[in-house]
Regions:
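Mid-to-C-terminal alpha-helical segments outside catalytic/metal-binding sites
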Residues: 203-229
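A general structural detector for well-ordered alpha-helical segments in enzyme core domains, enriched
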Residues: 21-25, 57-64, 119, 145, ...
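An N-terminally biased module of ancient metal coordination in phosphate/nucleic-acid-related enzymes
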Residues: 1-71
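Extended substrate/RNA-proximal surfaces in nucleic-acid metabolism proteins
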Residues: 48-157
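Non-catalytic positions within long, well-ordered alpha-helices that form the structural scaffold/packing
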Residues: 30, 124, 179-180
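Active-site beta-loop-alpha junctions enriched in small/polar residues
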Residues: 7-9, 42-43, 77-83, 109-111, ...
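Short acidic/histidine-rich active-site segments
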Residues: 183-199
């Protein structure tokens, strides 16, 4: 499996506060059957490490991963919080796309309604492929909105915990509705320290309830569009 949304890089956001915690999270991912992870530290408010700082942290973490013999391929990106300045931000070379591709992982305010479709349209016009992170978690999200996101060239990611974890009922309901309408492009862990990695369980759930091909697509094959190496 390929996990394209994970906060495992240590000491850069709210995902992990130590190298040891991050290495343990990598081990757990490996045990879940994850072979490739895109590390996606936040770019929002107080979490605004520079591109150069993140690249340095990533290089160091990869070396530590090799020392521990962990067999997971690592890549770098960011989860970008969208505000009114998003166009100047994404074109400024200050943020990281996923695996140095034109795919960008974007998130919005969970409660205050954002114009997700307008942002998707704007990013697409700028030459980016926007992936809306954890679409099911936005309280104002609807199936019609998801359909419009897709029609405008956007992609939809949901969290594994929203399928099989102990998340809020709304998250589970929306995630299953998205699957029923064939609107999900990616399932990812959105791992933070303290969260249970349930990628294996979520894969089994999707494979059984929908189809193995659907599970293969959303847990691996679709992400191969931008994974390099």
């Amino acid at each position: 499996m390929i996990d394209l949304h994970a906060h495992i890089l240590p000491n850069v956001d709210d995902g992990s506060n130590s190298l040891e915690d991050s290495l343990q999270m990598l081990l757990e991912a490996q045990e879940q059957g994850v072979t490739d992870i895109v590390l996606t530290p936040h770019h929002r408010r107080k979490f605004c490490k520079t591109k150069q700082e993140l690249l340095a942290e990533f290089k160091s973490f990869c070396l530590e991963k090799e020392k521990r013999g962990l067999n997971v391929n690592l890549y770098l990106g960011q989860e970008i919080y969208i505000d009114s300045n998003y166009k100047s931000l994404v074109t400024s070379d200050k943020i990281l796309t996923l695996c140095d591709s034109n795919y960008v992982l974007v998130e919005f305010d969970f409660v205050e309604e954002a114009d997700i479709t307008e942002v998707v349209y704007g990013l697409n016009k700028l030459g980016f492929k926007p992936i809306v992170a954890h679409f099911e978690r936005y309280t104002y999200a609807t199936i019609d909105m998801a359909k419009e996101v897709k029609s405008l060239g956007g992609l939809i990611q949901v969290n594994a915990q929203s399928l099989v974890g102990k998340g809020k009922f709304h998250f589970r309901k929306m995630t299953k509705a998205l699957f029923k309408q064939n609107l999900v492009d990616f399932v990812a862990s959105d791992m933070h320290l303290g969260r249970i990695n349930c990628m294996k369980k979520a894969y089994a759930f999707v494979s059984k309830k929908y189809s193995k091909q659907t599970a293969d697509n959303v847990f691996e094959l679709n992400a191969k569009r931008f994974i390099k190496g």
